[in-house]
Protein backbone atom coordinates (compact mmCIF):
# COMPACT_ATOMS: atom_id res chain seq x y z
CA UNK A 1 0.00 0.00 0.00
CA UNK A 2 1.38 3.40 -0.97
CA UNK A 3 2.02 5.93 1.78
CA UNK A 4 3.10 9.54 1.82
CA UNK A 5 6.83 10.38 1.67
CA UNK A 6 8.77 10.65 4.94
CA UNK A 7 12.29 11.67 5.93
CA UNK A 8 13.09 8.08 6.83
CA UNK A 9 12.19 6.89 3.33
CA UNK A 10 14.26 9.61 1.63
CA UNK A 11 17.29 8.88 3.85
CA UNK A 12 16.91 5.16 3.22
CA UNK A 13 16.74 5.78 -0.54
CA UNK A 14 19.91 7.91 -0.36
CA UNK A 15 21.74 5.25 1.65
CA UNK A 16 20.70 2.49 -0.75
CA UNK A 17 21.99 4.61 -3.65
CA UNK A 18 25.32 5.39 -1.95
CA UNK A 19 25.96 1.93 -0.45
CA UNK A 20 27.15 0.29 -3.73
CA UNK A 21 29.35 3.35 -4.44
CA UNK A 22 30.83 3.15 -0.94
CA UNK A 23 31.67 -0.57 -1.33
CA UNK A 24 33.12 -0.17 -4.82
CA UNK A 25 35.01 2.99 -3.85
CA UNK A 26 36.53 1.29 -0.82
CA UNK A 27 37.48 -1.75 -2.92
CA UNK A 28 39.13 0.20 -5.77
CA UNK A 29 40.43 3.05 -3.62
CA UNK A 30 38.39 5.83 -5.31
CA UNK A 31 35.72 6.38 -2.66
CA UNK A 32 35.06 10.16 -3.29
CA UNK A 33 34.68 9.67 -7.04
CA UNK A 34 32.31 6.74 -6.69
CA UNK A 35 30.20 8.69 -4.16
CA UNK A 36 30.12 11.74 -6.48
CA UNK A 37 29.05 9.57 -9.42
CA UNK A 38 26.34 7.96 -7.31
CA UNK A 39 24.90 11.30 -6.10
CA UNK A 40 25.12 12.76 -9.63
CA UNK A 41 23.21 9.78 -11.00
CA UNK A 42 20.56 10.23 -8.32
CA UNK A 43 20.17 13.93 -9.22
CA UNK A 44 19.91 13.11 -12.93
CA UNK A 45 17.19 10.56 -12.16
CA UNK A 46 15.24 13.12 -10.08
CA UNK A 47 15.58 15.80 -12.81
CA UNK A 48 14.36 13.31 -15.42
CA UNK A 49 11.28 12.53 -13.28
CA UNK A 50 10.68 16.28 -12.84
CA UNK A 51 10.68 16.70 -16.62
CA UNK A 52 8.22 13.80 -17.01
CA UNK A 53 5.96 15.33 -14.36
CA UNK A 54 6.11 18.76 -16.01
CA UNK A 55 5.26 17.22 -19.40
CA UNK A 56 2.29 15.40 -17.93
CA UNK A 57 0.97 18.49 -16.12
CA UNK A 58 1.36 21.00 -18.97
CA UNK A 59 1.36 19.05 -22.24
CA UNK A 60 -0.07 15.58 -21.85
CA UNK A 61 -3.90 15.48 -21.59
CA UNK A 62 -3.95 12.00 -20.13
CA UNK A 63 -5.55 11.56 -16.73
CA UNK A 64 -3.02 8.86 -15.79
CA UNK A 65 0.40 10.14 -14.62
CA UNK A 66 3.64 8.57 -15.89
CA UNK A 67 4.82 5.51 -13.94
CA UNK A 68 7.18 6.25 -11.07
CA UNK A 69 9.66 4.34 -9.00
CA UNK A 70 11.07 4.88 -5.56
CA UNK A 71 10.16 8.14 -3.88
CA UNK A 72 8.38 9.34 -7.04
CA UNK A 73 5.75 6.60 -6.96
CA UNK A 74 3.73 7.91 -3.95
CA UNK A 75 4.18 11.48 -5.21
CA UNK A 76 2.77 10.75 -8.68
CA UNK A 77 0.04 8.58 -7.22
CA UNK A 78 -0.95 11.37 -4.82
CA UNK A 79 -1.10 13.90 -7.68
CA UNK A 80 -3.27 11.50 -9.65
CA UNK A 81 -5.68 11.07 -6.70
CA UNK A 82 -5.80 14.83 -6.17
CA UNK A 83 -6.64 15.33 -9.83
CA UNK A 84 -9.43 12.75 -9.61
CA UNK A 85 -10.84 14.48 -6.52
CA UNK A 86 -10.70 17.87 -8.24
CA UNK A 87 -12.42 16.43 -11.29
CA UNK A 88 -15.17 15.00 -9.09
CA UNK A 89 -15.57 18.32 -7.31
CA UNK A 90 -15.71 20.20 -10.61
CA UNK A 91 -18.39 17.80 -11.82
CA UNK A 92 -20.39 18.26 -8.61
CA UNK A 93 -19.96 22.03 -8.81
CA UNK A 94 -21.01 21.99 -12.48
CA UNK A 95 -24.13 19.96 -11.61
CA UNK A 96 -24.89 22.35 -8.75
CA UNK A 97 -24.59 25.34 -11.08
CA UNK A 98 -26.81 23.59 -13.64
CA UNK A 99 -29.45 22.90 -10.98
CA UNK A 100 -29.25 26.50 -9.77
CA UNK A 101 -29.66 27.85 -13.28
CA UNK A 102 -32.45 25.40 -14.04
CA UNK A 103 -34.24 26.45 -10.85
CA UNK A 104 -33.69 30.13 -11.65
CA UNK A 105 -35.07 29.60 -15.15
CA UNK A 106 -38.17 27.97 -13.65
CA UNK A 107 -38.90 30.95 -11.41
CA UNK A 108 -41.85 33.15 -12.44
CA UNK A 109 -39.63 36.19 -11.87
CA UNK A 110 -36.71 37.83 -13.63
CA UNK A 111 -33.43 37.09 -11.81
CA UNK A 112 -30.21 39.07 -12.35
CA UNK A 113 -26.88 38.60 -10.55
CA UNK A 114 -24.66 41.69 -10.45
CA UNK A 115 -21.53 42.93 -8.76
CA UNK A 116 -21.80 45.58 -6.06
CA UNK A 117 -21.16 48.22 -8.73
CA UNK A 118 -23.94 46.83 -10.96
CA UNK A 119 -21.95 44.74 -13.44
CA UNK A 120 -24.10 41.87 -14.75
CA UNK A 121 -22.58 38.40 -14.64
CA UNK A 122 -25.72 36.26 -15.03
CA UNK A 123 -29.45 36.56 -15.76
CA UNK A 124 -32.24 34.11 -16.48
CA UNK A 125 -34.44 33.96 -19.57
CA UNK A 126 -37.31 35.90 -18.01
CA UNK A 127 -34.94 38.79 -17.28
CA UNK A 128 -34.17 38.92 -20.99
CA UNK A 129 -37.89 38.95 -21.76
CA UNK A 130 -39.06 41.43 -19.10
CA UNK A 131 -36.04 43.73 -18.74
CA UNK A 132 -34.84 43.52 -22.33
CA UNK A 133 -31.41 42.16 -21.37
CA UNK A 134 -29.35 40.16 -23.87
CA UNK A 135 -27.26 37.22 -22.72
CA UNK A 136 -24.35 36.72 -23.08
CA UNK A 137 -23.93 40.03 -24.96
CA UNK A 138 -24.65 42.05 -21.79
CA UNK A 139 -22.24 40.06 -19.64
CA UNK A 140 -20.15 42.61 -17.69
CA UNK A 141 -22.38 45.56 -18.64
CA UNK A 142 -23.56 47.84 -15.84
CA UNK A 143 -27.28 47.36 -15.31
CA UNK A 144 -27.70 51.11 -14.74
CA UNK A 145 -26.63 51.64 -18.35
CA UNK A 146 -29.30 49.21 -19.57
CA UNK A 147 -32.22 50.22 -17.30
CA UNK A 148 -32.14 54.00 -17.51
CA UNK A 149 -34.79 55.02 -15.00
CA UNK A 150 -33.98 57.71 -12.39
CA UNK A 151 -35.92 55.96 -9.61
CA UNK A 152 -34.09 52.68 -10.30
CA UNK A 153 -30.70 54.42 -10.26
CA UNK A 154 -31.57 56.14 -6.98
CA UNK A 155 -32.79 52.85 -5.50
CA UNK A 156 -29.47 51.11 -6.21
CA UNK A 157 -27.30 54.04 -5.12
CA UNK A 158 -29.03 54.60 -1.76
CA UNK A 159 -28.53 50.90 -0.88
CA UNK A 160 -31.80 50.85 1.09
CA UNK A 161 -33.30 47.53 -0.01
CA UNK A 162 -35.74 47.12 2.90
CA UNK A 163 -38.67 47.86 0.57
CA UNK A 164 -39.29 46.84 -3.04
CA UNK A 165 -39.21 49.36 -5.86
CA UNK A 166 -42.31 49.74 -8.04
CA UNK A 167 -41.12 50.66 -11.51
CA UNK A 168 -43.16 51.50 -14.62
CA UNK A 169 -41.27 50.70 -17.83
CA UNK A 170 -41.56 52.69 -21.02
CA UNK A 171 -43.62 49.80 -22.44
CA UNK A 172 -46.26 50.36 -19.75
CA UNK A 173 -45.30 47.21 -17.86
CA UNK A 174 -45.37 47.47 -14.04
CA UNK A 175 -42.50 45.79 -12.17
CA UNK A 176 -41.86 45.11 -8.50
CA UNK A 177 -38.07 44.98 -8.02
CA UNK A 178 -36.32 43.56 -4.96
CA UNK A 179 -32.55 43.67 -4.45
CA UNK A 180 -30.66 41.76 -1.76
CA UNK A 181 -27.01 40.99 -0.99
CA UNK A 182 -26.09 37.67 -2.59
CA UNK A 183 -22.49 36.92 -1.63
CA UNK A 184 -19.48 39.11 -0.87
CA UNK A 185 -19.80 42.26 -3.02
CA UNK A 186 -22.54 40.72 -5.17
CA UNK A 187 -26.26 41.51 -5.48
CA UNK A 188 -29.30 39.42 -6.39
CA UNK A 189 -32.07 41.34 -8.17
CA UNK A 190 -35.54 39.84 -8.56
CA UNK A 191 -38.08 41.62 -10.78
CA UNK A 192 -41.73 40.53 -10.81
CA UNK A 193 -44.26 41.58 -13.44
CA UNK A 194 -47.24 42.99 -11.52
CA UNK A 195 -48.97 44.53 -14.53
CA UNK A 196 -51.99 42.23 -14.26
CA UNK A 197 -52.25 42.83 -10.51
CA UNK A 198 -52.12 46.58 -11.15
CA UNK A 199 -54.85 46.25 -13.78
CA UNK A 200 -57.01 44.16 -11.43
CA UNK A 201 -56.59 46.75 -8.71
CA UNK A 202 -57.62 49.46 -11.16
CA UNK A 203 -60.61 47.37 -12.26
CA UNK A 204 -61.63 46.91 -8.62
CA UNK A 205 -61.49 50.66 -8.00
CA UNK A 206 -63.46 51.34 -11.17
CA UNK A 207 -66.01 48.69 -10.21
CA UNK A 208 -66.77 50.25 -6.84
CA UNK A 209 -66.78 53.73 -8.37
CA UNK A 210 -69.29 52.59 -11.01
CA UNK A 211 -71.52 50.83 -8.48
CA UNK A 212 -71.52 53.92 -6.29
CA UNK A 213 -72.35 56.09 -9.29
CA UNK A 214 -75.17 53.79 -10.43
CA UNK A 215 -76.77 53.76 -6.99
CA UNK A 216 -76.30 57.48 -6.34
CA UNK A 217 -78.85 58.63 -8.96
CA UNK A 218 -81.85 56.56 -7.76
CA UNK A 219 -81.01 57.23 -4.13
CA UNK A 220 -80.86 60.98 -4.85
CA UNK A 221 -84.29 60.80 -6.52
CA UNK A 222 -85.77 58.86 -3.60
CA UNK A 223 -84.26 61.23 -1.07
CA UNK A 224 -85.64 64.25 -2.95
CA UNK A 225 -89.19 62.91 -3.04
CA UNK A 226 -89.04 61.82 0.61
CA UNK A 227 -87.95 65.31 1.65
CA UNK A 228 -90.73 66.80 -0.48
CA UNK A 229 -93.31 64.49 1.11
CA UNK A 230 -91.97 65.31 4.56
CA UNK A 231 -92.44 69.06 4.00
CA UNK A 232 -95.96 68.85 2.56
CA UNK A 233 -98.38 66.06 1.68
CA UNK A 234 -98.59 65.25 -2.02
CA UNK A 235 -101.99 64.76 -3.61
CA UNK A 236 -103.48 63.85 -6.92
CA UNK A 237 -101.32 63.65 -10.04
CA UNK A 238 -98.21 64.93 -8.22
CA UNK A 239 -98.46 62.08 -5.71
CA UNK A 240 -98.97 59.47 -8.43
CA UNK A 241 -95.98 60.81 -10.38
CA UNK A 242 -93.80 60.73 -7.26
CA UNK A 243 -94.82 57.17 -6.40
CA UNK A 244 -94.30 56.05 -10.01
CA UNK A 245 -90.83 57.60 -10.15
CA UNK A 246 -89.86 56.15 -6.77
CA UNK A 247 -91.09 52.73 -7.89
CA UNK A 248 -89.02 52.97 -11.08
CA UNK A 249 -85.88 53.92 -9.16
CA UNK A 250 -86.29 51.11 -6.62
CA UNK A 251 -86.82 48.65 -9.48
CA UNK A 252 -83.68 50.00 -11.12
CA UNK A 253 -81.67 49.47 -7.93
CA UNK A 254 -83.18 46.02 -7.49
CA UNK A 255 -82.27 45.11 -11.07
CA UNK A 256 -78.71 46.35 -10.56
CA UNK A 257 -78.29 44.32 -7.38
CA UNK A 258 -79.73 41.21 -9.06
CA UNK A 259 -77.36 41.54 -11.99
CA UNK A 260 -74.40 42.08 -9.68
CA UNK A 261 -75.36 38.95 -7.75
CA UNK A 262 -75.79 37.01 -11.00
CA UNK A 263 -72.39 38.11 -12.25
CA UNK A 264 -70.76 37.28 -8.92
CA UNK A 265 -72.43 33.86 -8.87
CA UNK A 266 -71.25 33.05 -12.41
CA UNK A 267 -67.68 34.15 -11.66
CA UNK A 268 -67.57 32.02 -8.51
CA UNK A 269 -69.17 28.94 -10.09
CA UNK A 270 -66.83 25.95 -10.72
CA UNK A 271 -66.20 25.57 -14.44
CA UNK A 272 -66.11 21.77 -14.36
CA UNK A 273 -69.72 21.29 -13.17
CA UNK A 274 -71.54 21.34 -16.51
CA UNK A 275 -73.65 18.24 -16.00
CA UNK A 276 -77.20 19.64 -16.20
CA UNK A 277 -79.20 18.77 -19.30
CA UNK A 278 -80.43 22.12 -20.62
CA UNK A 279 -83.51 22.25 -22.86
CA UNK A 280 -82.48 25.32 -24.85
CA UNK A 281 -85.46 25.16 -27.31
CA UNK A 282 -87.95 25.34 -24.42
CA UNK A 283 -85.92 28.16 -22.86
CA UNK A 284 -86.06 30.09 -26.15
CA UNK A 285 -89.84 29.73 -26.38
CA UNK A 286 -90.14 31.46 -23.01
CA UNK A 287 -87.62 34.14 -24.06
CA UNK A 288 -89.58 34.70 -27.30
CA UNK A 289 -92.79 35.46 -25.40
CA UNK A 290 -90.97 37.79 -23.00
CA UNK A 291 -89.22 39.57 -25.89
CA UNK A 292 -92.56 40.12 -27.67
CA UNK A 293 -93.98 41.62 -24.47
CA UNK A 294 -90.90 43.81 -23.93
CA UNK A 295 -90.93 45.02 -27.52
CA UNK A 296 -94.59 46.09 -27.48
CA UNK A 297 -94.70 45.39 -31.25
CA UNK A 298 -91.96 47.95 -31.99
CA UNK A 299 -89.71 45.25 -33.50
CA UNK A 300 -90.39 42.11 -35.48
CA UNK A 301 -88.88 38.72 -34.64
CA UNK A 302 -87.81 35.50 -36.34
CA UNK A 303 -86.86 32.52 -34.16
CA UNK A 304 -85.13 29.67 -36.00
CA UNK A 305 -84.80 26.88 -33.44
CA UNK A 306 -83.59 23.30 -33.74
CA UNK A 307 -86.11 21.77 -31.33
CA UNK A 308 -84.05 18.62 -30.79
CA UNK A 309 -80.81 20.39 -29.93
CA UNK A 310 -80.10 20.21 -26.20
CA UNK A 311 -76.82 20.65 -24.34
CA UNK A 312 -75.14 19.83 -21.05
CA UNK A 313 -74.23 22.83 -18.96
CA UNK A 314 -75.43 25.22 -16.30
CA UNK A 315 -79.06 26.13 -16.96
CA UNK A 316 -79.07 29.39 -14.98
CA UNK A 317 -75.94 30.67 -16.72
CA UNK A 318 -77.20 29.80 -20.21
CA UNK A 319 -80.58 31.41 -19.45
CA UNK A 320 -78.79 34.59 -18.34
CA UNK A 321 -76.63 34.64 -21.48
CA UNK A 322 -79.46 33.96 -23.92
CA UNK A 323 -82.00 36.31 -22.34
CA UNK A 324 -79.50 39.17 -22.00
CA UNK A 325 -78.55 38.96 -25.68
CA UNK A 326 -82.19 38.93 -26.83
CA UNK A 327 -83.33 41.68 -24.44
CA UNK A 328 -80.35 43.84 -25.41
CA UNK A 329 -81.42 43.58 -29.05
CA UNK A 330 -84.91 44.74 -28.07
CA UNK A 331 -83.76 47.58 -25.80
CA UNK A 332 -81.02 48.98 -28.02
CA UNK A 333 -82.59 48.93 -31.49
CA UNK A 334 -85.13 51.45 -32.82
CA UNK A 335 -88.72 50.80 -33.84
CA UNK A 336 -89.07 48.82 -37.06
CA UNK A 337 -85.93 46.72 -36.51
CA UNK A 338 -86.08 43.03 -37.39
CA UNK A 339 -84.41 40.67 -34.90
CA UNK A 340 -83.42 37.11 -35.85
CA UNK A 341 -82.62 34.54 -33.16
CA UNK A 342 -81.04 31.22 -34.21
CA UNK A 343 -80.19 28.02 -32.34
CA UNK A 344 -78.73 25.43 -34.69
CA UNK A 345 -76.02 22.82 -35.28
CA UNK A 346 -72.74 23.94 -36.81
CA UNK A 347 -69.64 21.85 -37.69
CA UNK A 348 -68.01 22.36 -34.28
CA UNK A 349 -71.02 22.34 -31.96
CA UNK A 350 -74.24 24.27 -31.37
CA UNK A 351 -74.45 27.97 -32.21
CA UNK A 352 -76.72 30.57 -30.63
CA UNK A 353 -76.95 33.94 -32.40
CA UNK A 354 -78.95 37.16 -32.19
CA UNK A 355 -78.88 39.31 -35.33
CA UNK A 356 -80.57 42.62 -36.08
CA UNK A 357 -80.66 45.13 -38.93
CA UNK A 358 -80.44 48.13 -36.61
CA UNK A 359 -78.02 51.07 -36.67
CA UNK A 360 -74.99 48.96 -35.71
CA UNK A 361 -72.14 49.73 -33.33
CA UNK A 362 -69.05 51.83 -34.10
CA UNK A 363 -65.82 49.75 -34.22
CA UNK A 364 -64.15 51.62 -31.35
CA UNK A 365 -66.87 50.46 -28.94
CA UNK A 366 -66.81 46.73 -29.77
CA UNK A 367 -63.67 45.72 -27.78
CA UNK A 368 -65.13 47.30 -24.62
CA UNK A 369 -68.72 46.09 -24.85
CA UNK A 370 -68.18 43.26 -22.34
CA UNK A 371 -66.62 45.56 -19.72
CA UNK A 372 -68.73 46.11 -16.63
CA UNK A 373 -70.86 49.26 -16.75
CA UNK A 374 -69.66 50.17 -20.24
CA UNK A 375 -72.38 51.78 -22.37
CA UNK A 376 -72.32 52.94 -25.97
CA UNK A 377 -75.21 55.37 -25.40
CA UNK A 378 -75.37 56.15 -21.68
CA UNK A 379 -78.54 58.26 -21.89
CA UNK A 380 -80.49 55.59 -23.79
CA UNK A 381 -79.23 52.83 -21.47
CA UNK A 382 -80.53 54.63 -18.42
CA UNK A 383 -83.88 55.29 -20.13
CA UNK A 384 -84.27 51.58 -20.84
CA UNK A 385 -83.06 50.59 -17.37
CA UNK A 386 -79.80 49.14 -18.62
CA UNK A 387 -77.11 48.59 -16.00
CA UNK A 388 -74.16 47.99 -18.31
CA UNK A 389 -73.67 44.51 -16.84
CA UNK A 390 -75.60 42.41 -19.36
CA UNK A 391 -72.79 41.61 -21.79
CA UNK A 392 -70.33 41.09 -18.91
CA UNK A 393 -72.70 38.39 -17.63
CA UNK A 394 -72.93 36.87 -21.12
CA UNK A 395 -69.15 36.83 -21.51
CA UNK A 396 -68.53 34.99 -18.23
CA UNK A 397 -71.42 32.58 -18.76
CA UNK A 398 -70.25 31.46 -22.22
CA UNK A 399 -66.63 31.29 -21.04
CA UNK A 400 -67.73 28.78 -18.40
CA UNK A 401 -69.15 26.70 -21.25
CA UNK A 402 -65.80 26.60 -23.09
CA UNK A 403 -66.95 29.19 -25.59
CA UNK A 404 -66.47 32.88 -26.31
CA UNK A 405 -68.80 35.72 -27.27
CA UNK A 406 -68.36 36.87 -30.87
CA UNK A 407 -69.52 40.37 -31.85
CA UNK A 408 -69.85 41.47 -35.47
CA UNK A 409 -71.28 44.85 -36.35
CA UNK A 410 -71.40 47.27 -39.28
CA UNK A 411 -72.64 50.81 -38.77
CA UNK A 412 -75.88 51.29 -40.69
CA UNK A 413 -76.37 47.56 -41.36
CA UNK A 414 -76.78 45.84 -38.01
CA UNK A 415 -75.16 43.71 -35.34
CA UNK A 416 -74.70 40.00 -34.68
CA UNK A 417 -73.89 38.42 -31.30
CA UNK A 418 -73.10 34.70 -31.21
CA UNK A 419 -71.40 31.91 -29.31
CA UNK A 420 -70.80 28.21 -30.03
CA UNK A 421 -71.26 25.47 -27.43
CA UNK A 422 -68.57 22.84 -28.19
CA UNK A 423 -69.47 19.42 -29.55
CA UNK A 424 -68.62 17.58 -26.34
CA UNK A 425 -71.34 19.49 -24.41
CA UNK A 426 -74.14 18.60 -26.84
CA UNK A 427 -76.57 16.12 -25.28
CA UNK A 428 -76.22 12.64 -26.79
CA UNK A 429 -79.89 12.24 -27.65
CA UNK A 430 -79.97 15.53 -29.60
CA UNK A 431 -81.01 15.10 -33.19
Swiss-Prot record:
The name this protein goes by in its record: Phosphate regulon sensor protein PhoR
Gene source species: Escherichia coli (strain K12)
Annotated GO biological process: cellular response to phosphate starvation; phosphate ion transport; regulation of DNA-templated transcription; signal transduction
Domain Histidine kinase: 210-425
Modified residues (Phosphohistidine): 213
A GO MF term: ATP binding
Record keywords: ATP-binding, Cell inner membrane, Cell membrane, Kinase, Membrane, Nucleotide-binding, Phosphate transport, Phosphoprotein, Transferase, Transmembrane, Transmembrane helix, Transport, Two-component regulatory system
The PAS domain, residue ranges: 96-172
Compartments it resides in: Cell inner membrane
